[in-house]
């Protein structure tokens, strides 16, 4: 049962990290399109 909690916390951490990166990526992608 402990592994389930660890996986949940890990997934949540990765999800938040991915969300933060995905939100900071779009602006840079727009600049790349200009090139």
UniProtKB/Swiss-Prot annotation:
Subcellular location: Cellular thylakoid membrane
Entry keyword set: Membrane, Photosynthesis, Photosystem II, Thylakoid, Transmembrane, Transmembrane helix
Record-linked SUPFAM superfamilies: Photosystem II reaction center protein T, PsbT (SSF161029)
Membrane-spanning residues: 3-23
Superkingdom of the organism of origin: Bacteria
Statement: the UniProt record of this protein carries the keyword Cell wall biogenesis/degradation: no
Name this polypeptide is given: Photosystem II reaction center protein T
Encoding gene (name): psbT
């Amino acid at each position: 049962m402990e592994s389930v909690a660890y996986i949940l916390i890990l997934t949540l951490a990765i999800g938040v990290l991915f969300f933060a990166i995905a939100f900071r990526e779009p602006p840079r992608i727009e600049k790349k399109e200009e090139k």
